[in-house]
Amino acid sequence: MNNTHHHTNGYRTEKPKNEEDLEDPYANLSDFYKNHPAARNEACSSASNGGSKSVKMEPKVEKNEEFEEYIGDPVRLEDMEPFARPSLRDDAPLSSILHPDLDGIDPRIFFKDFNPNKTLRFSRLFAQNIKHTSRAEIWWASRTFSKHQRKKEPEEPLADDVIVGAKKLKLNIIEKVPRVMLADDEEERMRRPILTDAEEMAKKNEEGTVVQPWRTGPAKIWYDMMNLPMTSQAVNYGFKLKKSPQKVSIRSGKPLNYRTPDDLPSTSSGPAPNSAPFLDKVEVIDKSCEASTSEDILLPYQVIEWENDVILDGEEVKDQLLEEFSNGRGCGWIPTQYTRTYEHFVYAANNNAFEQMFDGKSAPINLTGPDSAILPTPGHSIFPSAPCDLDILPWETNIIWDADAMPSTLEPIDFLVDFQDDPLIYGMPEDRRHDEGPDHHHHHHHHRKDGQYTKKSKMILGQVQQRQKQEEDEQMESTMAQFTDNDPFNLSNDDYYVPKATSKTLSNNSLLIQHSTPATNIATHFFPTHPSAFRLRYWHRTPFTRRIVRHWQPMRFQPIQTPVKHQQRVAAMREAMRQAQGGGEVFYMRDVQDLSGKDETLVMIEYSEEHPVILSQPGMASKMKNYFKRRQANDSEPTFTFGELAFSHQIPFLGQLQPGQSLQSIENMLYRAPIYLHKRQNTDFLLIRSMNQWYIRPLPSIFVAGQQCPLYEVPSPNSKRATVFVRDFLFAFIYRLFWASDSSPRRLKMDDVRNAFPHYAESNIRKRLKMCSTFVRQGSETYWSLKPDFRLPSKEEVLSMVTPEMCCAQYSMMAAEQRLKDAGYGEKYFFTPENDEGSEDEVTIEDEIKCAPWNTTRAFLASQREKCLLDQTGIADPTGCGQGFSYVRVSQKPHKDENATPVPKKLVTGTNADLRKLPLKEAKQICRGYGVKEEEISALTRWEIIDVIRTLSTQAAKATKDGEIIAVSGMARFARGNTRFSSADMQEKYRKHCQRIFDQQNQTLANTDPISTDDDSTDADSDNEELASRLESMLEANKGKKNISMSEKAKIDFETEEKEREDLKRMIHGTTNQVEKGEKKEEGEVTAEEKKSASQFGEDVAMSASKISGITANQQLKIYRTCKGPDGKDVTRIEIVTRPQLIEAYTRIRMTRDDTFIQVYAQMDEQYKEEKRKKKRRLQDQIRRMKKNEEKAAHKVQKMTEKKVKPIKPPNPNLQKMRCSACHAYGHMKTNRNCPLYGKDPLTPLKEEDEGSTIMTSVSSASLVAPDAVQVDGTKVKFNLNFAEIRKEQNREEKLKRKLAKMAEAAVRERQMAHLMEYGGGASSSGGAGGGGSGIGGSTGGGITDNDDDDRFSQISGTSSFLNGPPGAIRGGNRNSSVSGSKRRSSMMPEEDYLQGPLKVAHRARADPKVVMSSMLTDIVNELKMISGSDAFVTPVNSKKVVDYYNIIKNPISLQEIKKKISEQSYLLRKDFLDDIKLMFDNSRMYNGDNNILTLTAQQMLQLAGKRMIEREQKFIGLEKQINPLLDTNDLIGFSYLLGEIVQKMKNIPKSALFHTRVDPKKIPAYYLKISDPMDLSIMEQKSKSQEYKSIDEFLKDAEKIYTNSVVFNGAESVYSLKAKEMFEMAEMLVKDQMDTLGELERNINPSAINDAAAAQRGLAMDSDDHMDEMEDHPTEEEEEDDDDEIMDDDMDIDATGYSYDHDDNVAVGQIFNDLAMSDSDEDERAEDVKRPANGDDNLLDSF
């Protein structure tokens, strides 16, 4: 016997010995399937040719009989039957529909078990279980539809007839015989001994000498239990083989050697064709008396208590199934409509999605989550991929259908693994070094230390090991608990009384939220790519501006509709949509229009927090849940209008409910917050604004939301998360643009991306675009084309890159960052790390930064993960009154007090006596003192009494304040151990604090009674002033006192306070003689005289205020306030004001302002109070930090040692020769601190050629204030001056200044006059002097001040700089010099910080006259719309309502069309505009008649338009002249304009660029040697602009000169000459075409006026460039008047510089915004439009 093992993967490949005894598995099939045409695989044919077909198939059937015995044998294709194409076969009628490419493919390449003449494998597997009732009647082969009648079987012929009628066999000879068709030798088979199964198996095991792989495989433990030898070759599993049926013939005269049908070949489809004549056989089953195998083996149903698993009611096991699915401990997964993969099943199980799947609703469920959520975790099993050999090997033969009737003996299966399988099956291989050989480990094992190099497996599984360990511990705990609970001797059912395990439900979010389609697609309407600063300031609080109601007029009707018709239309549309989809629930929120407040049920939720941590955008969904905690099992459920009821033992909030309480909450993926229903007022309503209409609805249900519990962390500014989000947002936007492109390949433009992300650098955008696209330039068009090798992510992948929750977190961060910037916090404060409690670092995080959402969300989520606790001091409390949680993280460890005396552990802290020696009588007395009852004391033993005393004493000691020493007597006398708070105590205290805040918040927010707001403090201003004074005093005290001891500092503070007290006393009482007389009084005593003086002082103050305001102190002011009461009625309240200042303010405001201003001013008061409150908090925080720093410094400061007085060194003679370059003094350098100009701008040395400037230098340096005179200390400026001496010095210098100023001005005037006379040719001296004066004054760096001396000083300085150096050379010098920039700030205040300011220069740019005219016409149109009855002319006439209008009116027009023409700048003349207005009037007359009200309205509009035109006629005339210069009265302007157009057309000639500018003399120096008079188009264009052409001949002469110059230099045949000739011919042609107009203008030109203008221009011309620039920068008064005449209107000029809002202090506090909002004028509206950015969200269709 061959013991060699072949790789068969556990399946036999050789023929078993008892194969002759096996039965064909398809032999017992009924005749219905044996004779079925489909079973024989025959085509539909008549009965005549059926026999031929069967005879023709006979050889194949015989051949397949041999192959059927070896079913499942892994054979090769060359060993199989040759493949026949279906197109060449007669039994394949449907081969024509097969694709030609598939005709030659053998299916056995993929499925070795396939045979065209055999039933398919899948059909054979299920053929055994086909019921009789499931059989299908096939009618396609019959001619009639009548029921088939069972045919009588023909009588069996005699044997002799069969033998005589036997047909001759036809041999089928095959050249290459397959191995499967070869049979064993008959002689060899006959020589084999006949052994029983047991003897044959024992013989195999004895002969075996090789250990088979299956013996040491995974089933080794079972084979060992069977005591099977290691060298066994076979296994007897105890199964019984099925006995072959004995078939006996009915006829008795059968010969013995007669061949039965069993000896004939048969197929799996039925018996052989020639077996039909034989008689039917009767199957005889041997009824054996042997015991069945099933009696010895326990079946699964006998072991499992299957009765308990029968589900009678699905609702009873619903919760149990949901809990099992939520835990995710199942070994398998259930594919559903939403869980098509195992990953989605795990994600759905973790998010409780099965509850929505089983609720019976057909609403679609969105299971799209982050990638990390659907990744499998180690707690869930992963199914390996199915082996590929399942399709090849006959695994179905090893299925045990009946252990007592096995078709064959089962052989052991070899467990083999393939390297293509999952590597987790056989583990990760050990990593080895590259320098190690096969035997290297044995020789050098002792030289290597453990952990010298890290395995890759450790690197891969390093992060997973910790999670696996935690899960194993949890599993072990649950297993032990299960073993304990399932004790068989535990008959008390303790598992029903064990409390449910509590878990942190806040840490995970198991909601399944489906947002609307616009929100899921990140629509730009709701998710802007870059919100503006204005929008971030009013995030989710868009103000109701006057721009929305600007068209509302007091006496005009404004139509407001109810949305009933809209609701009916939407309901009908959605019902039709629902019916079209088959009924059920349909998701309607698909478009932006569906997110409207005009339909469906509305709920209004107001957040109690001023700035919620995070808010969802419009279109995002939330859920309302109602939590209820039952008192007992039969407690009734509360009813709620909104939300779904949830019975929970523990609610997901910081506090818990008491039995019988309920709480509503709003939950989504971002946050969770409790909500409280409030009553709505009957007088309130909801006003909804759409694009063109207003709607009104009853006020919906109103809820108040409590403090949010964030579930999503907000990223920090400029953090990695925020940066990655912006990057992904940019990528998603780019991919969307590519998807939206219809071109091939897809493309986009750079401007689309840059406009969406203006804050992103263009280089970064290009960097992102280069990753997926290439830059293409096609003519003037440029775009980015998608790379052909780049796979564009699908739309689902793009949506997963940026989710709505990510956008909301980013917006929350940006809004908070903007608020902090407005409050004065820079970016350097955003990343200040939190300071540990025990750290000595003084850098602490600001309170405002602690309240930022990125810090609060991080702290809250960390507290839910039990990483920290939340602060209980209320720094980040949003309520400000202790009714909210402060989301600031605090360490879990108890606070260590350094000053506290350490208490030894396990010692008696309060007494030296030992409790064990305490007498019993005294112990009982102590218990009585604690309040223990006498009967309880009598029932206790001695040691129990001692334990009570120790416990009560320890609790009393812990109840004391931190840091106090425990008293020896009292409750804490016998305190035991360390009384400091432990972690458990901290946790308990924290839990009680959270519960108290939670209950207090619920009680406050659930209160529906109105709360009065009249109790606010009115002393906020005085408190702020007091805090400011205290802060200044503290800053002054701390300045320069870092190295002073505490005693000296206290002494200085006392002296300062005493001095201030004495000064205040003198101010109140005046000069007294008490100090001179030496009278003393006790400290703190107040005399009657002082009281009288104080009261007199208060009366004096009141009288002074009354004198100023004109109101006596006894007058009172009554204010009657009318407001709405709770019931909607008007209620009048009376308020009495007694303060004169308030009375005067109320009176002045009422007399000078209107009601609108007062209303806006009252609304602004709340904002003012809020700003004051924030300022007060910042001052308090600063004072607190300063006190803390002082306390820290007090422990470190030591007494200063007395400084030894060092002798003054004699001056160095070498230094005496050194001269300072800053102050020009000797003995030091400019970097020395002794220099008086140290840290300032150095003086610039003057040239000595001008005597006046030299003298002025000395005067200016002498007039500077001494450096020691002005000093800055903290926030105060100290002046140490002697005013008497300074005044004398100023008087002396004033005379000298006047004299020098006159001398310098005279000298400058003489030089300028000489210069003008030399070059100007007799220009007027006054203009030159004025220009020179203007230039001198404008050259100063400091501008003009209020002091006359300073004015003269600035003029003289400017003169000196004009003559000798650059402007500002004397005063100020170079303000950006390296000396002043490199030095640190000096304590001295520079003089120019107070005397000079920045010079603002406004450069006015000329506006487009078409734009100005359009704006003026728009104003007129808007005024026309205000006329009563003008609504009929605003829009075109509706042809459906007025059918015959367009038949009568051929030229219709409306104000809408007129406004469209204005926006397109189609009106260039006034006449065109008035003609359209008149056309509108004529159309109304023609259709409506002269006396119709619409015609009268059109007449009023025409009259008003003409009136406005007449009022601004001069401005319109000026604009028309600027638009079309031909309309100007000066013909020279029109003439020059036409010539300029001709020059432009000459420039447009192709390849004429060489003649546009002059020839460069550096490149072509020989040009100007030949050409003496050069000419080009730029010179001609300049002449036409300057109106130098007076005739046509001059113009043509210059054009011809370009051609002649080219001929002279290049030659007549040159290309350039031909191009110049073409230009000249073009000029002649254009002049000829416009000869009539040009000739008329030339004749109308006045030559005398031209000559005068030319002479005046030549007289003013100057050759000096410097003086020309000076004259241009400072025009004279006459030139300014001429400019004003040319401008014609101030509206045509736009200030390019404007007012700088960034440098105005009022912008920081919002004063300008408030002033603009309080004004009703049109100018204020324009200013508001300028200051406020464009916000496209104001035009949304809803009230969001």
From Swiss-Prot:
- Annotated Gene Ontology cellular component terms: nucleus; transcription factor TFIID complex
Q: Where is the composition biased (Gly residues)?
A: 1319-1344
The short sequence motif called Nuclear localization signal sits at 1379-1386
Name of the protein this chain belongs to? Transcription initiation factor TFIID subunit 1
Result of knocking out the encoding gene? RNAi-mediated knockdown causes embryonic arrest at the 100-cell stage, premature cell division of E2 cells, Ea and Ep, severe loss of polymerase II large subunit ama-1 phosphorylation and reduction in the transcription of several embryonic genes.
User: Where are stretches of biased composition, namely Acidic residues?
Assistant: 1012-1024, 1666-1694
Q: Which gene does this sequence derive from?
A: taf-1
Keyword Transcription part of the UniProt annotation: yes
* Comp. bias regions, Basic and acidic residues: 55-64, 429-439, 1076-1093, 1186-1205
Please give the residue ranges the record annotates as the region Disordered. 1-65, 248-275, 429-488, 1001-1024, 1071-1098, 1186-1213, 1319-1391, 1666-1702, 1714-1744
Bromo domain boundaries: 1404-1512, 1537-1634
Major place of localization? nucleus
- Report the function annotation for this chain: The TFIID basal transcription factor complex plays a major role in the initiation of RNA polymerase II (Pol II)-dependent transcription. TFIID recognizes and binds promoters via its subunit tbp-1, a TATA-box-binding protein, and promotes assembly of the pre-initiation complex (PIC). The TFIID complex consists of tbp-1 and TBP-associated factors (TAFs), including taf-1. May regulate RNA polymerase II activity and thereby may control transcription initiation by RNA polymerase II. Required for early embryonic development. Essential for embryonic transcription of several genes.
Task: Give the GO terms filed under biological process for this record.
Answer: embryo development ending in birth or egg hatching; RNA polymerase II preinitiation complex assembly; transcription initiation at RNA polymerase II promoter
| Low complexity: bias regions | 1372-1381
Keywords for this entry?
A: Bromodomain, Coiled coil, Nucleus, Repeat, Transcription, Transcription regulation
> Quick check: keyword Repeat in the entry?
yes
Entry-linked SUPFAM superfamilies: Bromodomain
Composition bias, kind Basic residues: at what positions? Answer: 440-449
Q: How does it assemble?
A: Component of the TFIID basal transcription factor complex, composed of TATA-box-binding protein tbp-1, and a number of TBP-associated factors (TAFs).
Coiled-coil region(s) at which residues?
1019-1080, 1161-1204, 1282-1314
Please state which protein family the record places this protein in: Belongs to the TAF1 family.
* UniProt biased composition (Polar residues): 43-52, 477-488, 1354-1363
Q: What are the protein's GO molecular function terms?
A: DNA binding; histone acetyltransferase activity; protein serine/threonine kinase activity; RNA polymerase II general transcription initiation factor activity; TBP-class protein binding
User: Per the UniProt entry, what species is this protein from, by scientific name?
Assistant: Caenorhabditis elegans
Q: Where does this protein reside within or beyond the cell?
A: Nucleus
